[in-house]
Amino acid sequence: MERIYLDNASTSFPKAEGVAEAVYQYIKECGCNINRGGYDEAYQAEELVLETRQRLTALFHGPDCRNVVFTRNITESLNVLLKGFLRPGDHVLVSAMEHNAVMRPLTQLQSRGVSFDRIPCAGDGTLDTSAMAALLRDNTRAVVMLHASNVCGTVLPAAEVGRPVRGRYLRSH
């Protein structure tokens, strides 16, 4: 029976051609940490990471490859982003369907003076974008919203959500 993988919001499978081979080659031929040694393999590893940062910056039209940070997974990435970016007095908007990887750090940040509001969703998983404008505040620093739900299959309207925040000093994830 053919296997059909439907949880790509969790992880990708099968991996793209060459991924397993590249990881194996790195483990077998290099296996060192970058910025931890003054020998050829360490320099090669550092160059590989720099090249990867540059490629990702170009792919996502980023301003500077030094802004690319690698983490183990999206949960860690969200924690680094939210806890590093938000300050006491900041406000965040999140969709009502956000994953615990977003909600847990935001709930923790409430004790540090960060507040958040949930943008309501209808029973079918669609986002109430008209309610979003009413929830925006002068101190809103971020809009955190999944793009596609692996629970109900809804694709949220990222472009539509971005319109009312364009030109404000905040980030949309």
Mark where each language-model region is.
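Pyridoxal 5′-phosphate
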Residues: M1-H173
